[in-house]
């Protein structure tokens, strides 16, 4: 799978992801970019799960952002509704972490749109490791959002066999 982590701190929000793509037990590619900017660089998003499924969801999410003039929560709720109710979309296996200057959300195929505590998101196979590391760093250091995301992703990569050390990181200024 993968690890995606998002941290919001001191006027910045970051989403970072590793680059490993696996097929069964085999690493197929080590430099996949699972984090990208959407909607005129005002939204950042990362995915965990099937690559083709995630790219389909990115496209659909960007359309929802366009329909709702970039309103992150409305676009996320609409995507989650479609994902849950459409027979073809329901088969897509991925999780999305998305953020803009105001909010950080997890979007699932079950129709869930979750705004996590402390605006800390960690999804994918290495998610629990990254979340524990990021939480400890948030509570005990003055590191920036970017530094926390990098360190948390590095720790997840040391522990999770489905997470590597090729990182893609996107950052936005944040109001929260």
Curated annotation (Swiss-Prot):
Active site feature: 2
EC number: 3.4.25.2
Keyword set includes Protease: yes
Keywords, ordered alphabetically: Allosteric enzyme, Cytoplasm, Hydrolase, Metal-binding, Protease, Sodium, Threonine protease
Top enzyme category: hydrolase
HAMAP family: HslV
Subunit structure and binding partners: A double ring-shaped homohexamer of HslV is capped on each side by a ring-shaped HslU homohexamer. The assembly of the HslU/HslV complex is dependent on binding of ATP.
Name recorded for this polypeptide: ATP-dependent protease subunit HslV
Gene: hslV
């Amino acid at each position: 799978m993968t690890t995606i982590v998002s941290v919001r701190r001191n006027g910045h929000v970051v989403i970072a992801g590793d680059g490993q793509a696996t097929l069964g037990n085999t690493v197929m590619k080590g430099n996949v970019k699972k984090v990208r900017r959407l909607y005129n660089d005002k939204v950042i998003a990362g995915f965990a799960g099937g690559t083709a499924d995630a790219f389909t969801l990115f496209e659909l999410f960007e359309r929802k952002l366009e329909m709702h003039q970039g309103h992150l929560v409305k676009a996320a709720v609409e995507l989650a509704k479609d994902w849950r109710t459409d027979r073809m979309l329901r088969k897509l296996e991925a999780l999305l972490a998305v953020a803009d200057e105001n909010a950080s959300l997890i979007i699932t195929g079950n129709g869930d749109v979750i705004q996590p505590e402390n605006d800390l998101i960690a999804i994918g196979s290495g998610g629990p490791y990254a979340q524990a590391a990021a939480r400890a760093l948030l509570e005990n250091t003055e590191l920036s959002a970017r530094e926390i995301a990098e360190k948390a992703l590095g720790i997840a990569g040391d522990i999770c066999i489905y997470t590597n050390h090729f990182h893609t990181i996107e950052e936005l200024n944040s109001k929260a």
